[in-house]
Amino acid sequence: MTMYKEYNTNQLSLELNLAYDIPMNHEARLISLFVDSIPNHVLLEEKSHTGRPAFHPAMLLKMTLFAYARQVFSGRKIVQMNDEVIPMKWLSQDTYVSYKTINNFRSSKHANNLIKTAFIYFTLLMRENGMIEDDALFIDGTKLEADANLYSFTWKKAINKYEDTLNGKTAELYDTLVQEGVDLALSKEDCETSEGLVHLLEDTEQALAAVEKAISEEPKVIKGGSANKQKRRRIKKLRNQLKKDYLPRKQRYEKNRDILKERNSFSKTDHDATFMRMKEDHMMNGQLKPGYNVQAATNGQYVLAYDIFSNPTDTRTLKPFLNSIQTLDLFQHIVADAGYGSEENYVFIIDELAKTPLIPYGMYQKELTRKYKNSPNNPCNWNYLEETDQFMKPDGVIYSFKSYSRRCDKYGFQRDFKIYEADKIQDTPELEELAKTEGGNQKHIYYNPTWNYFKELIKEKLTSEEGSRIYAKRKTDVEPVFGRLKSVFGVRRVHVRGRQAVQTEIGFLFMSMNLTKLAKNLALRTLNTQKPHSDFIVLIVFKAEIVVWFYFKASFCPASLPQLLPLESP
């Protein structure tokens, strides 16, 4: 007979577990130590002194980070983890927490501020322990779908179109009221706003009341019918049209315009989401979906800063993103792909931030090809005559300076150009023909000295030994973070609505990814430096004094930065 160990779930046991314990190298311990290193003046918020005491934010933050590290994003499932998973019980100290408490904490303004501050402390921790290399920030972006209905779009062009039609109908109604003898206290142009329509409705109501009074003073029977009753019928019809149709539509259009701001679209179920083209296009029709543009700054595949934007492209996000990074002074090199290369971004990074951009411009790779370098139609391949301020085309056509030009884009950035026009008198009649367009006009080119200066500077930086070495790390530094976010954590769509809530959730995701990666790296480092089967303790030393030892936009910074020291267990 085969022997088995005794197994009986109905057997009464006298053994009582009075404490929950987890291994010393467990990621839950690192999460707990990191959160405990954040000072109380950052963790705690001002609460009411009456009523039931609130749960400590440190406990809620630990629970949320550990749940996100285990790819659990539902409030009810986090509560289930708290009932079943021992590391979660250890973090919460076996405290019962409702799913509403978890969800309220995740969507609160305090959690948003708390996770932003946590990234500052994490960056300082990484730098103090020598885990930040080359003083470089690697920046990239990805798009995540919003928690919004797919066909809940509202388009700016549609609002403008329908509002123009409504203004035309309102003008016709205004003229009709004037023909009916209604005394109006505002002009026709004033009726193009909701406030103007409200005043127009009030004037119409007063005119209708005056007609009602006139009807009450008339005899009951009038031969041929009462003219006032016919007038009342016409004015009442106009009043109802204005009250039930024109005014609500105008108010809805103005409300939608306030929601849009500078965007071209938004979702009715998540007003902060913007419709964008996603990489995951399963229908292969370029379908637009509501989403957010997530920007992340990394070093060593650790996310050190992040933010979300409504811009579908990355070019316009770089400047506000860099302004939001409070530890930017720790880094000298800003590394990104060609999607961020623009004159405005180069001016901002070099002139205002005094940083080194390792960001190629859009034509950088193409300009390195032999075909582009040998093309006679590219002004960069022409011979510049500095003494006479002229360009000579390879075919011999001379272009002389004509005038200056300034262009301003819709965002307010100005670009200065020099216009060069082909001379009417060339050395030969053949060249004079080449100097003209098909329409018989003189050819001309626009030359941007500032842009060409930055192009040459970027080429020099990217081809230098240090610049090429740092830029070569970009693909293996920042892009794996998004791959891990989407493939390992399975996050291609956010789970909350509203910009603040989405920003907080993305922060929880990135911080949980950082801490789990850090725990694995520490475990590997310990295995490589210590004897097999030996445990290690991650010790975070924190001193509660506050000093400002370098300039950044946060108000506080630890005097003794956190340190990670692998120690042998006794």
Regions found by a protein language model. Give the residues of each.
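A ubiquitous short alpha-helical element
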Residues: M1, E46-T50, E466
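Hydrophobic alpha-helical membrane-insertion signals
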Residues: M1-R29
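Anion-binding and metal-coordination hotspots
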Residues: Y4-E6, T64, V72-D83, T95-Y96, ...
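Basic, short loop/linker segments at the boundary and entry of helix-turn-helix/winged-helix-like folds
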Residues: M24-L65
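Short, locally clustered residues in the helix-turn-helix/winged-helix DNA-binding domain
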Residues: Y68
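Bromodomain acetyl-lysine reader domains
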Residues: V85-P87
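Conserved active-site neighborhood of enzyme catalytic/cofactor-binding cores
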Residues: L91
